[in-house]
């Protein structure tokens, strides 16, 4: 208590300033809040040699004599010599590592101000747009500052963030106004960045490669300019030590940790040098050390002039001290907006002062999270050494109403409205698009990136090639030495059927890699870094070398081990036919994966489809003998196995002659009629190849429709929703 007493000039007891509900708080607890206007004392990290004792630079908005708004450097204070002041109620903040530390020079502001007034967001419920997720929210954010939207789960944090960024889903409707630099103009491409809670990274690329390809996809201009932007993003997010490290690692090296991956996701948006950066849960799944490092890095980014707005569930005391302003939400209602220290005073005035040894964010969530009521009910007979289990002895719903009413009648709410009026009374600089890379450039970048990823993904590509070789060797040894007699026709037909069917079925092993590509596309498309056509064309061109390598290696082994006709032109047709078969199969897998977006359901569906196509391919029963409904129409005609096998058999038997006895002979077409139905036309095999080519493009056209118009959202969304319901019921 001696240390607390020594800080009496900066702190006062909440019992002397709180409103009447303070009586509900046990007297055995001591609560202290900072006096308004007192300076923030940063913590020193004496045990960390990487952080120097630098002054804490606080960027805040002040009114000048001329009535304008300006960003001024606040008074800097020396670093506290110890961590003990954290326990005395001081909102501690670690020093921000900057290039010009200690010089007191404020960097040029390149951000943009954003303000929102009476912002309400509704979602489609039982009645159209009946569920209000965000209710009449007001707030603002300045360049060079960090504004955090805090609240419990399902409080409307992410919805408010998406509304500010203009990224609400079609099922949501927004009311109210959002101003950027004083005007209601839409933020163009490249003027802002948005980082999702969970982003998909490419594990087989290094950090520098990943950011460089992202810059090539996003930015126009010359290569050397993009390299400079990438290096700036790496420096800004403190990724220099990991720049040449694979994101996902490999057999002999671990990949990046969750905190480092999160910083890479943010760095990807920084290559556009946005004025405003929106981040959904930057501390998601991060431990305390990674969380603190993340926030210090973001603080450094804010000091460069960028406007940061992000959501957060809870934070430690050190992290909380880094925030400039806080928007506290509960059930869509704004319980407070203002500076972080003023939020502590607000809770104290409402009768819920923060205990000395408790993190402010934990205290806020305890007071406004209704889930704690169930825990208190379960533990109502439990008491700690000081008496009560909880410091807030009030029903959460009552606490929320008290905090909301206190805020609406406070000077903080009036100051927010006054600042919004001041920010919107005149229009500032309009944000302009910085341009984007052309479609041809994006296709070339995605193609080259796909080739690089395939060359490094041994688990999904090279292992798949090995499996194809093992399968082909197995089939080749099983059907070796057949000869060219009439008696070997049935066995040769079976060998071709087994080769095409089983090789296509084995291609399902590539589903995980395709799902990763779809997730990467969705992540890039959400920020307009890529498009459906560009993605499909780049993926198609990038997969051609790998699929052709598999087709030529497997075809050569099978062709010579089984002993098919010794003719180079026939061999080339065999290779091309099987290559087209793999292209169709890849398109089918991409189509199914795009529908489900789940490994289990995609694999199950593909296996079922392949089995049906194999049954209708004409080997187990000739196509003319198949039942007309279902099996002939449509299965026999939509099965790509049918056209591939038919073309390969026409390639093998048309023009061939078999001797029957010593004087009689029959054509290859006549010899195969009892085993498989083919056409006697010598050009029929090329028609079958054209059908395969059309199917390869047809499946990708269906994928384009799904990606472009989002027709798969309802199917996959319902599946995931039912899956979550089943898990919750368990």
Swiss-Prot record:
It is found in: Membrane. Keywords: ATP-binding, Membrane, Nucleotide-binding, Phosphoprotein, Transmembrane, Transmembrane helix, Transport. Residues 47-56 have a biased composition (Acidic residues). Its main location: membrane. Residues 441-653 form the ABC transmembrane type-2 domain. Residues 114-356 form the ABC transporter domain. Residues 72-91 have a biased composition (Polar residues). The modification Phosphoserine is found at residue 93. ATP binds at residues 151-158. GO terms for molecular function: ABC-type transporter activity; ATP binding; ATP hydrolysis activity. Residues 1-28 have a biased composition (Low complexity). This is ABC transporter G family member 3. It comes from Arabidopsis thaliana.
């Amino acid at each position: 208590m001696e240390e607390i007493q020594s800080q009496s000039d900066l702190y006062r007891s909440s019992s002397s300033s709180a409103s009447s509900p303070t009586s509900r708080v046990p007297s055995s607890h001591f609560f202290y809040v900072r006096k308004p206007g007192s300076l923030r004392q940063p913590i020193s990290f004496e045990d960390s040699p990487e952080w120097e004792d630098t002054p804490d630079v606080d960027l805040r908005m002040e009114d000048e004599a001329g009535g304008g708004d300006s960003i001024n450097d606040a008074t800097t204070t020396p670093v506290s010599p110890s961590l003990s002041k954290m326990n005395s109620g001081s909102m501690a903040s670690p020093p921000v590592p900057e290039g010009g530390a200690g010089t007191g020079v404020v960097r040029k502001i390149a951000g943009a101000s954003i303000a929102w007034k009476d912002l309400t967001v509704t979602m489609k419920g039982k009645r159209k747009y009946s569920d209000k997720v965000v209710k009449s929210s007001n707030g603002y954010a300045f360049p060079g500052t960090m504004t955090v939207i805090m609240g419990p789960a399902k409080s409307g944090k992410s919805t408010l963030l998406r509304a500010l960024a203009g990224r609400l889903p079609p099922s949501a409707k927004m009311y109210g106004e959002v101003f950027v630099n004083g005007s209601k103009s839409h933020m163009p491409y490249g003027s802002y960045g948005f980082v999702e809670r969970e982003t998909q990274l490419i594990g087989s690329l290094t950090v520098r490669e990943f950011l460089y390809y992202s810059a090539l996809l996003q930015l126009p201009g010359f290569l050397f300019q993009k390299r400079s932007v990438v290096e700036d993003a790496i420096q800004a997010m403190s990724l220099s030590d990991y720049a040449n490290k694979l994101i996902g690692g490999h057999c002999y090296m671990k990949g990046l940790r969750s905190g480092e991956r999160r910083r890479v996701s943010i760095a990807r948006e920084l290559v556009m040098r946005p004025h405003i950066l929106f981040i959904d849960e930057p501390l998601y799944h991060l431990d305390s050390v990674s969380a603190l490092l993340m926030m210090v890095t973001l603080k450094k980014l804010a000091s460069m002039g960028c406007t940061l707005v992000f959501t957060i569930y809870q934070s430690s005391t050190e992290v909380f001290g880094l925030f400039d302003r806080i928007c506290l939400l509960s059930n869509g209602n704004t319980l407070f907006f203002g500076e972080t220290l003023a939020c502590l005073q607000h809770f104290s005035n409402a009768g819920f002062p923060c205990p000395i040894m408790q993190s402010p964010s934990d205290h806020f969530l305890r007071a406004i999270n209704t889930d704690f009521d169930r825990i208190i009910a379960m533990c109502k007979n439990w008491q700690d050494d000081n008496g009560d289990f909880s410091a807030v002895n009030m029903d959460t719903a009552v606490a929320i109403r008290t905090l909301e009413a206190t805020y609406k009648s406070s000077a903080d709410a009036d100051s927010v409205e006054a600042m919004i009026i001041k920010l919107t009374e005149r229009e500032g600089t309009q944000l302009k698009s910085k341009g984007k890379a052309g479609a041809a450039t994006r296709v070339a970048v995605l193609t080259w990136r796909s080739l690089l990823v395939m060359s490094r993904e041994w688990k999904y590509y090279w292992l798949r090639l090995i499996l194809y070789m093992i399968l082909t060797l197995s089939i080749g040894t099983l059907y070796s030495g057949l000869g060219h007699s009439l008696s070997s026709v049935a066995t040769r037909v079976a060998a071709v059927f087994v080769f095409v069917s089983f090789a296509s079925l084995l291609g399902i092993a590539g589903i995980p890699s395709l799902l990763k590509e779809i997730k990467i596309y969705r992540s890039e498309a959400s920020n307009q870094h890529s498009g459906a056509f560009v993605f499909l064309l780049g993926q198609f061109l990038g997969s051609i070398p790998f699929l052709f390598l598999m087709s030529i290696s497997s075809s050569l082994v099978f062709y010579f081990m089984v002993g098919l006709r010794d003719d180079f032109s026939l061999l080339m047709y065999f290779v091309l036919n099987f290559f087209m078969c793999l292209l169709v199969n890849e398109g089918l897998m991409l189509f199914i994966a795009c529908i489900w977006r789940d490994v289990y359901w995609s694999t199950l569906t593909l296996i079922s489809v392949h089995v049906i196509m194999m049954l209708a391919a004409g080997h187990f029963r000739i196509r003319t003998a198949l039942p007309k409904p279902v099996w002939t129409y449509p299965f026999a005609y939509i099965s790509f196995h049918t056209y591939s096998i038919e073309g390969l058999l026409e390639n093998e038997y048309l023009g061939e002659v078999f001797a029957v006895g010593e004087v009689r002979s029959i054509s290859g077409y006549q010899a195969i009629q009892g085993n498989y139905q083919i056409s006697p036309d010598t050009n029929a095999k090329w028609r079958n190849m054209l059908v395969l080519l059309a199917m390869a493009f047809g499946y990708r056209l269906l994928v384009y429709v799904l990606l472009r118009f989002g027709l798969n959202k309802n199917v996959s969304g319902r599946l995931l929703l039912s899956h979550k319901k089943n898990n919750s019921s368990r």
